[in-house]
A protein has these predicted regions:
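Juxtacatalytic substrate-recognition/specificity segment
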Residues: 63-192
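An active-site-proximal "capping" alpha-helix that borders the catalytic cofactor pocket
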Residues: 101, 195-207
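Non-catalytic architectural context of zinc metalloproteases
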Residues: 1-111, 129-132
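C-terminal recognition in membrane/secretory proteostasis and scaffolding
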Residues: 204-205, 213-471
Length: 471
């Protein structure tokens, strides 16, 4: 932005048509209306440039609602181009979720006003395609396709907004100098994405079991899925090294693992803290202590954080970080699960040839229309037998050419392949055309599930589990 003016106050005037209103957590200092020309001017004043970037504003035709949760006013603004959804449609699920989050967080969150800005994209037009959300201190912006069904939209909002709301804790309240003085032109990354994104993602799941929104098994299944996803990445790379270098070519493709193994680091640390404190202290208590020590206006030095965590908790926590966060040792999940009376069990389950449930093994290039096998994921037994590699471009399957336009034909035809029939897939691998052949066979993948051990109700492990999930 304007050079060397990051710490100066800003006054922003926005001229808007009268039929559009602002959705934002900012309160306008003035609002000048001119009924003669059907335009009005909203004026906002903030203390420094960061506050400009930290307060998104969405102007749209009025579709807003609000509710109060334990002293916090929540604003919900929705833009739905065809009018398929309204703020009132979405309000019940959001209100239930944020009420549970506020109860879970307790006194760590003193935000007085919070805005949720939902932009629903029209896929029939040249509209937004980057779906997801971005957190701010007092608001979250969300972009999702309007084509979603109501139940699907509610579920996405629950998962996405809950994650973003928990960013109130970190990095918004607890963060390093790299975050506080972030230079968008020359970004320097922190070592602690395990906390900023990993712990946040863990909280977004933990609060749901803690507040009774999901069952114990639902929570275990989510953690199991994260373990499986994390195994598609190098499990020996120190997480702090990856985090600090996440923008480099070597590590940029590992960012998704921040939400997988990062959350699992949070889970393992939570269990270890519960074990050392006889169930009294968990990772939320740690984040409250860090928030009190630092807060949004006092960043920490990157290299000091782990030492501060050890000082605020137990000396034994140092070895946890030395092994599993700054070290190269993979987390022995079974050992941590055993502490709380859980165990992992593996079994083989059936999949489709090109789909594992809702997760595809193939993707498409919108520009070229080409189909290719995805990189960074594990394949089923059939694709492994076939010799498929991530990045292989599909030319033909059993003599038929396939592109994005007829990909569903590929899925459908594969469902009728007979056991033992000959399958031939021609792929382009690094510019070389290769023919892959195999006999059709039921594709399978190994699935690991987390289950509760059969233990008496008064078992110390059961009590520790209850403290971990419900306290």
């Amino acid at each position: 932005y304007f050079s060397k003016l990051q710490e100066e106050p800003y006054r922003i005037e926005i001229l808007r048509p009268d039929n559009l209103i602002a959705g934002t957590s900012l309160t306008p200092t003035t609002k000048d209306e001119n009924p003669d020309d059907n335009f009005s001017t909203d004026t906002y004043t903030v203390g420094r440039y960061f506050e400009v970037t930290d307060h998104p504003i969405m102007y749209a035709k009025p579709d807003t609602t609000s509710f109060d949760v334990q002293g916090m006013k929540v604003l919900l603004d929705v833009y739905s181009p065809t009018g398929k959804f309204s703020a009132q449609d979405i309000k019940p699920g959001i209100e239930k979720m944020i009420s549970a989050q506020k109860k879970f967080l307790g006194d760590i969150n003193d935000t007085e006003k919070y805005a949720i800005l939902l932009y629903l994209s029209d896929l029939q037009k040249k509209d937004a395609r980057g779906f997801g959300a971005l957190e701010h201190h007092t608001s979250t912006t969300v972009v999702l396709p309007e084509t979603m069904q109501k139940a699907q939209l509610d579920e996405s909002m629950k998962d996405v907004v809950s994650h973003e709301f928990f960013h109130i804790v970190t990095p918004l309240s607890v963060h390093s100098n790299e975050i506080h003085y972030f230079d968008y032109n020359d970004p320097k990354m922190s070592q602690h994405l395990w906390m900023y994104e990993g712990v946040t993602e863990y909280f977004a799941n933990l609060f749901q079991i803690n507040q009774g929104l999901i069952s114990n098994q639902d929570f275990y299944d989510r953690m199991s899925e994260k373990i499986a996803s994390s195994m598609n990445f190098d499990d020996t790379v120190p997480f702090t090294v990856m985090s600090e270098n996440i923008l480099t070519d070597q590590y940029k493709d590992s960012y998704y693992n921040v939400y997988q193994k990062g959350a699992l680091i949070g889970m393992a640390l939570d269990i270890r803290l519960r074990e050392l404190s006889d169930g009294k202290i968990g990772i939320l208590d740690l984040m409250k202590k860090l928030s009190k020590k630092y807060g949004k206006d006092k960043p920490f030095n990157d290299e000091d954080l782990i030492g501060d965590i050890v000082a605020l908790t137990y000396p034994e926590i140092q070895s946890f970080f030395d092994q599993y966060v700054t070290g190269e040792t993979p987390i022995p999940y079974n050992q941590f699960f055993a502490k709380v009376g859980l165990e992992e069990k593996s079994s083989m389950i059936n999949t489709g040839y090109f789909l594992n449930g809702q997760v595809p093994y193939i993707d498409g290039d919108p520009a070229s229309g080409e189909l290719f096998f995805r990189k960074g994921i594990g394949f089923n037994t059939f694709l492994e037998k076939l010799g498929v590699e991530g990045g292989d471009i599909i030319k033909t399957v059993n003599g038929t050419e396939y592109t994005i336009k007829n990909v569903y034909g590929l899925i459908t035809s594969s469902q009728s392949w007979e056991e033992g029939s000959d399958i031939e897939i021609v792929v382009d691998r690094d510019g070389e055309e290769i023919t892959l052949t195999a006999k059709a066979s039921q594709p399978q993948v190994e699935e690991t599930s987390i289950t509760e051990m059969e233990l008496p109700a008064d078992s110390p492990k059961v009590k520790l589990r209850e403290a971990w999930l419900k306290n």
